[in-house]
């Protein structure tokens, strides 16, 4: 009985996998073309969560001018790496101006992000290169978005911003199109693979 269920699971996974293959490819290309932002609040208090957003704005403002004319994510990552001391200083100045004694630690890393919905687009779950900003003890809620392309501040210019940064029309469509179905397929495909390959006789 268990083997029969595994056969059914295999067939289901195969069919879903064929459908998902193109979406998986788009998702991988999308992750490779973005530099994400992850800001972690010191705590979940109202004050710490409010200043977290001020720090976010200070971080993005410190990078905006240099990122504006870049058209390649690798160049953006290199630029942000060189700017880390300035980013950290800007964030710490923001905290001090708001009357906080906490300090900020910034780093470039790779992190797992959940699926996130924004005003004009959505991003699939996965591992992304990211600028990580931790305030104080870093025990508060997170704020996730994108450093490059500057999508989180693009507003109505979202499509143009994505295009200038080198995202193809297909990938831009992945962000703003039928993303709920596409990302649902990705998540179910991952669950099916884990369930099948982790099962035993």
Please report, for each region that a protein language model flagged, where it lies by residue.
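Mid-length scaffold segments of soluble, non-membrane domains
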Residues: 77-146
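Alpha-helical transmembrane signal-anchor/signal-peptide segments
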Residues: 28-39
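Soluble extracytoplasmic domains of inner/organellar membrane proteins
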Residues: 120-179
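Short extracytoplasmic
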Residues: 38-69
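Second-shell loop/turn segments in exported
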Residues: 38-46, 71-82, 134
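C-terminal partner/receptor-binding element of secreted or periplasmic proteins
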Residues: 164-201
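Sec-exported extracytoplasmic/periplasmic mature domains
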Residues: 56, 60-68, 85, 89-96, ...
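Hydrophobic membrane-insertion alpha-helices, especially the h-region
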Residues: 6-23
């Amino acid at each position: 009985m268990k083997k029969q269920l595994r056969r059914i699971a295999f067939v289901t996974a195969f069919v879903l996998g064929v459908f998902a293959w193109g979406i998986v490819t788009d998702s991988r290309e999308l992750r490779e073309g973005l530099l994400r932002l992850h800001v972690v609040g010191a705590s979940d208090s109202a004050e710490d969560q409010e200043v977290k957003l001020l720090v976010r704005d200070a971080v993005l403002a410190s990078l905006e001018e240099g990122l504006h004319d870049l058209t390649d994510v690798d160049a953006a990552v290199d630029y942000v790496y060189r700017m880390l001391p300035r980013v950290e200083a800007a964030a710490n100045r923001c905290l001090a101006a708001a009357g906080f004694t906490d300090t900020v630690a910034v780093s470039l890393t790779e992190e797992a992000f959940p699926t996130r919905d924004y005003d004009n687009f959505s991003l699939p779950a996965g591992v992304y290169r990211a600028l990580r900003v931790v305030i104080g003890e870093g025990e508060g809620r997170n704020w996730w978005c994108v450093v490059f392309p500057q999508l989180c501040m693009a507003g109505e210019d979202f499509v143009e911003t994505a295009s200038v940064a080198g995202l193809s029309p297909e990938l831009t469509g992945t962000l703003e199109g039928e993303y709920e179905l596409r990302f649902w397929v990705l998540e179910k495909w991952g669950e099916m693979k884990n369930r099948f390959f982790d099962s035993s006789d």
